[in-house]
């Protein structure tokens, strides 16, 4: 079984600040981490490796410094790491990102592609499903459990819903998007860390993925972020102990004070 896990390097959102003049994220000096949902997906892949001897590849698209999360994944136990980096890929929105990653995946053998549900720096939850559409593969999102049947080569996925869950079955090859909250990723071991720095991280450019330039990077991005801003904190609420009859009058008076009515 061959599994490919798509991961992303993201800024630690607990440290993120926003430039008030430009409305953009200030990334300089902010520590970067592996996206939590992606790390959860990686753990599911490694569990299948432990149980069935699966070969696990990780791929990320980003700047050269994204190699750090690939080394982390190698230290956790993956077999192969690929960094997709090129100036032509810069400025990509989710559609252009998924086009580039899908192009890379077309050159690889896989039975299962795992992505995180969404990245904490964008929260779109679009890239995983878009990859599935580019590759014309069945997909299940919001995965919170994953099982494999060797005899039938099918995956059984528990999908989170708002008020419960579904259990679905898909034939390989297929795509799933994972939830960080559903699994505890393993820690890197000392031996894994040492071994990770002896392993090769493959570096691929845009010429390796065979995707037209008008479909990648800024040129292939029909959307762009106009502005980012911090959440506006609301003032503390008030509590009143009144009868139902008094409550109506109180609410009306408060609405008048706010010039709502």
Task: Go through the PLM ranges and name each one.
Residues 1-261:
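N-terminal glycine-rich FAD/FM-binding segment characteristic of electron-transfer flavoproteins
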